[in-house]
Amino acid sequence: MVVEANCEIPENLYYYIDGKNTVWVKIEGSDIAVVGITDLAQTMAGKIVKIRIKKKGIKVERGRPVATLESGKWAGPVPAPVSGEVVDSNSEVEKSPVILNRDPYGQGWIAKIKISNQEEVKQLLTGQQAIQKLKEIITSEKLTCKRLQ
């Protein structure tokens, strides 16, 4: 785990970064992408009060929303890091969205997507490349991450 400005960056995950939108991805088996928002994303959003997640069976395209978040200061998409079909969504974060602020890499997972294009996994960032890009966002946004209790 790398920590930069109090922002946690797990080294064992993949990342989809589109501007300031930062999403983490964990591959389960060979074709399931577990998706969530990063520590940076939850800090920039502030206290998340609502999340809408695409339902099971819905097809999503890479870069298009798999969910939408609302906080007191921000509303916007959680982009799908890969194309595929939503096979599960986290009903716990829909009931209690603040879980995303408290545990973005654990209980705060958002959706599971059955990957339809394996080539897109190769386009995700990982390792030092991901860490460097996330550190650049932390610096440019002057972020110091904090978790809500």
UniProtKB/Swiss-Prot annotation:
The keyword Lipoprotein does not apply. Residues 32-114 form the Lipoyl-binding domain. One of its GO terms (biological process) is glycine decarboxylation via glycine cleavage system. One of its GO terms (cellular component) is cytoplasm. InterPro entries: 2-oxoA_DH_lipoyl-BS, Biotin_lipoyl, GCV_H, GCV_H/Fam206, Single_hybrid_motif. Keywords: Lipoyl. The keyword Transit peptide does not apply. CDD domains: GCS_H (cd06848). The modification N6-lipoyllysine is found at K73. Its cofactor is (R)-lipoate. Binds 1 lipoyl cofactor covalently. The glycine cleavage system catalyzes the degradation of glycine. The H protein shuttles the methylamine group of glycine from the P protein to the T protein. HAMAP family: GcvH. Belongs to the GcvH family. The glycine cleavage system is composed of four proteins: P, T, L and H. This is Probable glycine cleavage system H protein 2. The lineage of its organism: Archaea, Thermoproteota, Thermoprotei, Sulfolobales, Sulfolobaceae.
